[in-house]
Design a protein with these regions (language model features):
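Rossmann-like dinucleotide-binding cores of NAD(P)H-dependent redox enzymes
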Residues: 60, 154-210, 290, 308-324
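FAD-site-proximal beta/loop scaffold in flavoenzymes
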Residues: 120-143, 219-221, 227-299
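Short hydrophobic core segments
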Residues: 8, 81, 98-108, 228-238, ...
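Glycine-rich dinucleotide-binding loop and its adjacent helix/turn
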Residues: 107-165
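Conserved beta-strand-loop-beta-strand element in the redox core of flavoprotein oxidoreductases
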Residues: 84-98, 212-227
Length: 384
């Protein structure tokens, strides 16, 4: 009996691949292993659940049992893969060995955790999956006071969603303005002003010194001397590609699991997909590249090697208070050129040669997306 194609991870990447494989091959044996409950949901919905009027259960699009029936797959939930043996085409779940024909790592990314001190350091929550979100919602009282650590994409999206629905939100970040890695200062300030209009308070240019429990609340001591009293602390300081399993198996890892143009790792018949991937020296930490990757990887797994191409894919930041669209520039020397009047701003990032390699649009300027996308280089162009 042929060993199944095995996918580690049941997030958007893993399930999208399983769907495409099943579409292309109705009888193919497919096994999916996941550490969580296996229910499928759309991860970007986590940071706009209040706006959608949904709790954690309401975010489920397909239950694990429905996935098994719809896709005719073996889906093992609450299952942790502890070891990969690429040479043997085998993985281990504790002391149980499972053979595979081809293996796909769709392990995603894990939250970066700040080293914190104080009696409430262990009370900090992160939201990286639906079960995390359930714990976060359970911790929120009505009209909660929430401190968000991090003014990046996830921090700003949660700030918008929470503040727009009656919660008192404060955001702390070492940076001088929101989305500092994605926006020039003028646009970051426009976003800051819009979120301030919802009641969001900002503590920028400062870090967190300690967190302590006082009564039923948490007191955050900021590095600038300010004290903030809140009910809940949410850490949104970023994600790190989940590479441990691959690294322990001897696969090449750097920022992520290193893959070639066909998404194969340094080991034969082992591939990677989604947030854990590094291709051409870059991570692909957003949802849109997954569709392109799957369209290449599925036929590759079925015997038709196909290279993945990733064109420019602007990211929609879910901050309705200030609509924002970003095509992040690569890590190259250059600078932003900004035009317009806040909040309706257009920004182009040009490299040292003057070539446009990124853009950002805020407010009404987001309507000009189609003007900018054709000017952008691909995120990754496979070798000829």
């Amino acid at each position: 009996m042929t060993a199944p194609i095995t996918i580690i991870g049941s997030g958007h990447a893993g399930i999208t691949l399983a769907r495409e494989l099943r579409r292309l091959s109705p009888e193919l044996p497919i096994r999916v292993l996941t550490r969580d409950d296996g229910h499928y949901y759309y991860k970007p919905d986590l940071s706009k659940a209040f706006a959608a009027g949904k709790d954690a259960e309401g975010l489920i699009k397909s239950t694990a049992e429905q996935l098994r029936e719809q896709l005719k797959i073996e889906l093992r939930c609450r299952t942790t893969v502890t070891r990969i043996e690429p040479a043997a085409h085998r993985i281990w779940v504790g002391d149980q060995a499972l053979d595979y024909s081809k293996l796909v790592l769709a392990t995603g990314a894990t939250p970066i955790r700040l080293p914190l001190s104080g009696s409430a350091a262990d009370a900090v929550l992160t939201v990286n999956d639906r079960e995390d979100y359930a714990r976060f919602r359970a911790a929120l009282p009505d009209k909660a006071r929430v401190l968000i650590l991090g003014a990046g994409l996830i921090g700003c999206e949660f700030a918008n969603d929470l503040a727009a629905h009656g919660h008192a939100v404060q955001v702390a970040d070492l940076a001088g303005w929101p989305l500092p890695r994605l926006l020039p200062e003028a646009q970051g300030r426009a976003l800051q002003t819009a979120l301030s209009g919802l009641g969001v308070q900002w503590h920028l240019g400062t870090g967190l010194a300690s967190l302590d429990r006082e009564g039923g609340a948490i007191t955050a001591q900021l590095a600038n001397g300010q004290r903030v009293v809140v009910d809940v602390v949410l850490s949104a300081v970023g994600l790190r590609a989940a590479t441990a399993l691959a690294s322990e198996a001897g696969l090449t890892t750097r920022l992520g699991v290193v893959v070639d143009d066909r998404l194969q790792t340094s080991a034969a018949d082992v591939y990677a997909l989604g947030d854990c991937v590094e291709i051409g020296g870059r991570l692909l930490p957003y949802i849109l590249p997954i569709a392109n990757a799957v369209k290449a990887l599925a036929p590759t797994l079925l015997g038709t090697p196909t290279k993945a191409r990733f064109p420019a894919m602007p990211v929609i930041v879910k901050t309705p208070a200030c609509p924002t669209l970003v095509n992040p520039p690569p890590a190259v020397e250059g600078g932003w050129e900004v035009t317009g009047t806040a909040p309706d701003l257009e920004a182009v990032f040009k490299d040292a040669s003057g070539r446009p390699v990124g853009f950002a649009l805020t407010g009404k300027a987001t309507a000009k997306r189609a003007d900018y996308v054709p000017l952008m280089p691909a995120i990754h162009e496979p070798a000829a």
